[in-house]
Amino acid sequence: AKRPKGGQMSVVMGAGASGILLHEAMGHAFEADFNRKGQSIFSDKMGQRVCPEGINIVDDATIRGNRGSLNFDDEGVPGQRTMMVENGILTSYLHDRISAKFYGVAPTGNGRRESFRSSPIPRMRATYMESGNANPEDIIASVEKGVYVDEFSNGQVKIGEGDFTFFVKSGYL
Protein backbone atom coordinates (compact mmCIF):
# COMPACT_ATOMS: atom_id res chain seq x y z
CA ALA A 1 0.00 0.00 0.00
CA LYS A 2 1.07 3.54 -0.72
CA ARG A 3 1.95 5.75 2.28
CA PRO A 4 -0.87 8.31 2.78
CA LYS A 5 -0.28 12.05 2.90
CA GLY A 6 0.12 13.29 6.48
CA GLY A 7 -1.95 15.96 8.17
CA GLN A 8 -4.71 16.49 10.67
CA MET A 9 -7.72 14.26 10.22
CA SER A 10 -10.38 12.48 12.19
CA VAL A 11 -9.58 9.01 13.54
CA VAL A 12 -12.08 6.22 14.13
CA MET A 13 -10.76 3.14 15.93
CA GLY A 14 -11.94 -0.43 15.93
CA ALA A 15 -12.46 -2.21 19.26
CA GLY A 16 -8.98 -3.75 19.43
CA ALA A 17 -7.15 -0.55 18.52
CA SER A 18 -9.17 1.59 20.91
CA GLY A 19 -8.59 -0.94 23.70
CA ILE A 20 -4.81 -0.82 23.25
CA LEU A 21 -4.84 2.98 23.09
CA LEU A 22 -6.99 3.22 26.22
CA HIS A 23 -4.81 0.75 28.12
CA GLU A 24 -1.49 2.33 27.20
CA ALA A 25 -2.27 6.04 26.81
CA MET A 26 -4.72 6.39 29.72
CA GLY A 27 -4.89 3.21 31.81
CA HIS A 28 -1.42 3.42 33.35
CA ALA A 29 -2.09 7.06 34.23
CA PHE A 30 -4.94 5.84 36.51
CA GLU A 31 -2.55 3.68 38.58
CA ALA A 32 -2.26 5.36 41.98
CA ASP A 33 1.51 5.00 42.43
CA PHE A 34 2.11 7.28 39.43
CA ASN A 35 -0.44 9.78 40.76
CA ARG A 36 0.96 9.73 44.29
CA LYS A 37 4.39 10.62 42.87
CA GLY A 38 2.94 13.34 40.61
CA GLN A 39 4.02 11.40 37.50
CA SER A 40 0.59 11.09 35.87
CA ILE A 41 -1.39 13.55 33.81
CA PHE A 42 -4.24 12.74 36.24
CA SER A 43 -2.30 13.66 39.40
CA ASP A 44 -4.41 16.13 41.42
CA LYS A 45 -7.37 15.78 39.02
CA MET A 46 -9.69 13.74 41.27
CA GLY A 47 -13.27 14.96 40.93
CA GLN A 48 -12.47 16.95 37.79
CA ARG A 49 -13.53 16.46 34.18
CA VAL A 50 -10.83 14.50 32.35
CA CYS A 51 -12.93 13.18 29.42
CA PRO A 52 -15.95 14.38 27.47
CA GLU A 53 -19.38 13.97 29.05
CA GLY A 54 -20.80 10.47 28.56
CA ILE A 55 -17.43 8.69 28.84
CA ASN A 56 -17.17 5.94 31.47
CA ILE A 57 -13.87 4.08 32.00
CA VAL A 58 -13.83 0.94 34.14
CA ASP A 59 -11.28 -1.56 35.45
CA ASP A 60 -13.05 -4.84 36.15
CA ALA A 61 -11.37 -7.90 37.66
CA THR A 62 -14.70 -9.74 37.94
CA ILE A 63 -15.41 -10.48 34.26
CA ARG A 64 -15.62 -14.27 34.17
CA GLY A 65 -13.09 -15.83 31.80
CA ASN A 66 -11.30 -12.55 31.07
CA ARG A 67 -7.49 -12.60 31.09
CA GLY A 68 -7.32 -9.86 33.76
CA SER A 69 -9.97 -11.40 36.01
CA LEU A 70 -9.19 -12.72 39.47
CA ASN A 71 -10.81 -13.53 42.77
CA PHE A 72 -8.14 -11.77 44.85
CA ASP A 73 -5.21 -9.50 44.04
CA ASP A 74 -1.66 -10.21 45.22
CA GLU A 75 -2.43 -8.59 48.61
CA GLY A 76 -5.51 -10.72 49.30
CA VAL A 77 -7.98 -7.95 48.42
CA PRO A 78 -11.02 -9.21 46.47
CA GLY A 79 -11.02 -8.36 42.77
CA GLN A 80 -13.69 -5.80 41.95
CA ARG A 81 -15.16 -3.45 39.38
CA THR A 82 -13.74 0.07 39.74
CA MET A 83 -15.24 3.04 37.89
CA MET A 84 -12.29 5.39 37.25
CA VAL A 85 -14.11 7.89 35.05
CA GLU A 86 -17.85 8.40 35.33
CA ASN A 87 -19.58 10.67 32.84
CA GLY A 88 -16.18 12.25 32.10
CA ILE A 89 -15.29 12.91 35.78
CA LEU A 90 -12.27 11.22 37.42
CA THR A 91 -13.75 9.27 40.33
CA SER A 92 -11.03 6.79 41.36
CA TYR A 93 -7.44 5.73 40.86
CA LEU A 94 -6.46 2.05 40.90
CA HIS A 95 -5.10 1.21 44.37
CA ASP A 96 -3.00 -1.29 46.23
CA ARG A 97 -3.01 -1.18 50.05
CA ILE A 98 -0.21 1.42 50.27
CA SER A 99 -1.75 3.93 47.87
CA ALA A 100 -5.21 3.38 49.37
CA LYS A 101 -3.85 4.28 52.81
CA PHE A 102 -2.10 7.36 51.37
CA TYR A 103 -5.33 8.58 49.74
CA GLY A 104 -7.58 7.53 52.64
CA VAL A 105 -9.70 5.17 50.53
CA ALA A 106 -10.30 1.41 50.35
CA PRO A 107 -7.99 -0.69 48.16
CA THR A 108 -9.50 -1.47 44.75
CA GLY A 109 -8.05 -4.97 44.39
CA ASN A 110 -5.30 -3.87 42.01
CA GLY A 111 -2.21 -4.85 44.04
CA ARG A 112 0.00 -6.79 41.66
CA ARG A 113 3.47 -8.31 41.99
CA GLU A 114 5.86 -8.76 39.11
CA SER A 115 7.22 -11.84 40.89
CA PHE A 116 7.42 -13.30 44.39
CA ARG A 117 10.54 -11.14 44.92
CA SER A 118 8.77 -7.81 44.37
CA SER A 119 6.30 -5.80 46.40
CA PRO A 120 2.79 -5.28 45.03
CA ILE A 121 2.06 -2.08 43.13
CA PRO A 122 -1.28 -0.88 41.69
CA ARG A 123 -1.80 -2.16 38.15
CA MET A 124 -4.75 -2.53 35.79
CA ARG A 125 -6.66 -5.77 35.38
CA ALA A 126 -9.22 -5.37 32.57
CA THR A 127 -9.61 -1.70 31.70
CA TYR A 128 -12.17 -0.62 29.13
CA MET A 129 -14.46 2.20 28.06
CA GLU A 130 -18.16 1.39 28.33
CA SER A 131 -20.09 1.35 25.06
CA GLY A 132 -21.99 4.44 24.06
CA ASN A 133 -25.24 4.70 22.14
CA ALA A 134 -23.73 5.45 18.72
CA ASN A 135 -23.81 2.87 15.96
CA PRO A 136 -20.25 2.11 14.66
CA GLU A 137 -21.39 2.43 11.02
CA ASP A 138 -22.88 5.88 11.76
CA ILE A 139 -19.61 7.00 13.37
CA ILE A 140 -17.62 5.94 10.29
CA ALA A 141 -20.17 7.55 7.93
CA SER A 142 -19.94 10.85 9.84
CA VAL A 143 -16.24 11.25 8.95
CA GLU A 144 -15.64 13.08 5.66
CA LYS A 145 -11.83 12.80 5.66
CA GLY A 146 -10.13 10.51 8.12
CA VAL A 147 -8.58 7.18 8.93
CA TYR A 148 -10.06 4.01 10.39
CA VAL A 149 -7.50 2.27 12.62
CA ASP A 150 -7.90 -1.46 12.98
CA GLU A 151 -4.59 -2.24 14.70
CA PHE A 152 -1.69 -0.40 16.38
CA SER A 153 1.85 -1.56 17.09
CA ASN A 154 5.05 -0.13 18.56
CA GLY A 155 3.77 2.69 20.73
CA GLN A 156 5.36 5.05 23.21
CA VAL A 157 3.58 6.81 26.08
CA LYS A 158 4.61 9.62 28.44
CA ILE A 159 1.92 9.33 31.12
CA GLY A 160 3.06 12.46 32.93
CA GLU A 161 2.49 14.59 29.86
CA GLY A 162 -0.42 12.76 28.27
CA ASP A 163 1.75 12.38 25.17
CA PHE A 164 1.65 9.21 23.08
CA THR A 165 2.66 7.88 19.68
CA PHE A 166 1.53 4.66 18.00
CA PHE A 167 2.31 3.14 14.61
CA VAL A 168 -0.82 2.23 12.65
CA LYS A 169 -0.24 -1.38 11.62
CA SER A 170 -3.61 -1.76 9.90
CA GLY A 171 -5.74 1.21 8.87
CA TYR A 172 -7.89 2.56 6.06
CA LEU A 173 -8.44 6.05 4.61
Outline where the language-model segments fall.
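N-terminal small-residue-enriched
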Residues: 1-173
